[in-house]
Curated annotation (Swiss-Prot):
<protein>
    <recommendedName>
        <fullName>Indole diterpene prenyltransferase paxD</fullName>
        <ecNumber>2.5.1.-</ecNumber>
    </recommendedName>
</protein>
<feature type="binding site">
    <location>
        <position position="264"/>
    </location>
    <ligand>
        <name>substrate</name>
    </ligand>
</feature>
<feature type="binding site">
    <location>
        <position position="268"/>
    </location>
    <ligand>
        <name>substrate</name>
    </ligand>
</feature>
<dbReference type="GO" id="GO:0140873">
    <property type="term" value="P:paxilline biosynthetic process"/>
</dbReference>
<feature type="binding site">
    <location>
        <position position="349"/>
    </location>
    <ligand>
        <name>substrate</name>
    </ligand>
</feature>
<feature type="binding site">
    <location>
        <position position="102"/>
    </location>
    <ligand>
        <name>substrate</name>
    </ligand>
</feature>
<comment type="pathway">
    <text>Secondary metabolite biosynthesis.</text>
</comment>
<dbReference type="InterPro" id="IPR017795">
    <property type="entry name" value="Aro_prenylTrfase_DMATS"/>
</dbReference>
<feature type="binding site">
    <location>
        <position position="418"/>
    </location>
    <ligand>
        <name>substrate</name>
    </ligand>
</feature>
<dbReference type="GO" id="GO:0004659">
    <property type="term" value="F:prenyltransferase activity"/>
</dbReference>
<comment type="function">
    <text>Indole diterpene prenyltransferase; part of the gene cluster that mediates the biosynthesis of paxilline, a mycotoxin that acts as an inhibitor of mammalian maxi-K channels. PaxG, the geranylgeranyl diphosphate (GGPP) synthase is proposed to catalyze the first step in paxilline biosynthesis. Condensation of indole-3-glycerol phosphate with GGPP by paxC then forms 3-geranylgeranylindole (3-GGI), followed by epoxidation and cyclization of this intermediate (by paxM and paxB) to form paspaline.</text>
</comment>
<feature type="binding site">
    <location>
        <begin position="80"/>
        <end position="81"/>
    </location>
    <ligand>
        <name>L-tryptophan</name>
    </ligand>
</feature>
<feature type="binding site">
    <location>
        <position position="190"/>
    </location>
    <ligand>
        <name>substrate</name>
    </ligand>
</feature>
<dbReference type="Pfam" id="PF11991">
    <property type="entry name" value="Trp_DMAT"/>
</dbReference>
<feature type="binding site">
    <location>
        <position position="266"/>
    </location>
    <ligand>
        <name>substrate</name>
    </ligand>
</feature>
<keyword id="KW-0808">Transferase</keyword>
<comment type="similarity">
    <text>Belongs to the tryptophan dimethylallyltransferase family.</text>
</comment>
Length: 438
């Protein structure tokens, strides 16, 4: 009896002990808690850390996932966080001989899409407010500043929403996404805001709005200005026009261990161009980021690009990949600004969901890349761990959505982002027959 109890994974044990307020939470726990548990197994988290992370997800994230999908599989609130509107993701970061688990989700409620909350803003406000007491450093000054700048009163939002005929744009216009990093005994919360609705309302470019909102912090923005100027110069450059790069959203930390003025600010760009030369142009902000470290970074980026993307034989660096039919296919970048830094740190998100190889071939490519980096921890055996975590009876349960790359110090900084295949996780009686009854 005791040995059977020891085999119960933390996600299942917590569900038995804590239960759920409704069937929607039960559904989201099944499709979110389980792959997260598997990812923590991969990252060698201790049992106590698994319970800590999962308890946080159970209390603060699962209730914000909103109603479960409709019987036909459609999401209650369509959003392009993932290509099929899945509003959750799990991820694992590899850097400096460590593996760190992360999550991301777009808070949703029953009011989302109604006249009470037409563009889905309320759930994010409620979620951040509920977490305020978790750590002394959870200062909401920046959150209030940016939501005041970009969240829109319901009366005005209802008018904007009614006037917008292109619903693809509406799904891209994510007002707020929350993500969480879980290093040892810590929780780091990041908020991402897309000012697309505000841009449509005031008829100003999103990049202009983002830069202005950061400058509007006044004295609190002083330490960001050097790096911000580099990004602003690129936004207004011919290189940005040629590469099709445009600012799409920005992010900042809220849950800090020290003063809010030490937060990072990240500005994200997107492009639909997939030529490798174009990737390098944007990654270097049109050559504004240079030097020996950047040369090493672009060399390693090429290796990862070749290892994971479905590149036709003979494709030149100045040629684009065959176009994806998916409406939001493209490449994302972010530029991380630290207070006092002269230049931002670049990151690129390789679009596996749109232009990547098959998942197991991506896993092979990641193995090759990791070996080339000299990484040899147990969690660096990428394909073996990926199969153990996310392949069951020959079916892929979590697909690669993106793989991000940046370069810090002397090494690559890699994060793999996964989209749970909800239809594979959705039958609780199959996945946890002892817990959920058919």
């Amino acid at each position: 009896m005791q040995s059977d109890e020891l085999q119960i994974p933390p996600w299942e044990s917590l569900a038995e002990g804590l239960g759920f307020s409704n069937a929607d939470e039960e559904y989201w726990w099944t499709v979110f808690g389980q792959p997260l548990n598997k990812l923590m197994d991969w990252a060698d988290y201790s049992t106590s850390e698994k319970y800590r992370v999962l308890a946080f997800i159970h209390r603060y994230v699962i209730p914000t996932c909103g109603p479960r999908p409709k019987p036909n599989g459609d999401q209650y609130w369509d959003t392009f966080m993932g290509f099929d509107h899945t509003p959750i993701q799990v991820s694992i970061n590899f850097y400096n001989s460590k593996a760190t688990v992360r999550t991301g989700n777009i808070p949703i409620s029953e009011a989302s899409g109604t006249t009470e909350d037409p563009i889905n803003q309320k759930a994010s406000l409620d979620t951040i407010a509920s977490q305020r007491h978790l750590v002394p450093g959870h200062n909401l000054r920046l959150f209030k500043h940016f939501t005041d700048a970009f969240f829109i009163p319901n009366e005005e939002a209802n008018i904007l929403n009614a006037e917008l005929e292109n619903r693809t744009i509406a799904m891209q216009a994510v007002q707020c996404m929350l993500s969480y990093d879980f290093p040892y005994r810590q929780i780091q919360t990041k908020v991402a805001i897309c000012p697309m609705w505000k841009s449509m309302q005031v008829k100003r470019p999103m990049g202009d709005l983002m830069i202005s909102s950061i400058k509007d912090l006044g004295i609190d923005a002083a330490d960001y200005m050097k790096s911000l100027k580099v990004i602003e110069d690129f936004i207004n450059s011919e290189k940005a026009v040629q590469s099709g790069a445009y600012a799409i959203f920005f992010a900042f930390d809220t849950m800090l261990t020290d003063d809010y003025q030490r937060t990072r600010v990240k500005i994200y760009f997107a492009t639909q161009s997939t030529a490798f030369n174009n990737m390098v142009d944007i990654f270097t902000l049109g050559g504004r980021l240079d030097g020996p470290e950047m040369q090493r970074a672009t060399k390693e980026l090429r290796k990862l690009w070749m290892s994971t993307m479905a590149i036709p034989d003979g494709l030149r660096d100045d040629e684009t990949l065959p176009k994806s039919p998916l409406p939001c296919a493209g490449v994302i970048f972010n530029f991380e600004i630290w207070p006092g830094a002269d230049k931002p740190n670049p990151k690129i998100y390789l679009p596996c969901a749109y232009y990547g190889k098959d998942d197991l071939d991506i896993a092979d490519g990641m193995d090759s890349f990791f070996k080339d980096q000299g990484w040899s921890k147990s969690f660096h055996s990428y394909k073996d761990n990926y199969i153990k975590a996310f392949v069951k009876d020959g079916k892929v349960m979590c697909r690669h959505h993106d793989i991000s790359f940046s370069y810090k110090g002397q090494g690559a900084y890699i994060t793999a982002y996964y989209k749970p295949e909800l239809s594979e996780y959705a039958d609780p009686s199959v996945w946890a027959p002892k817990l959920f009854k058919a």
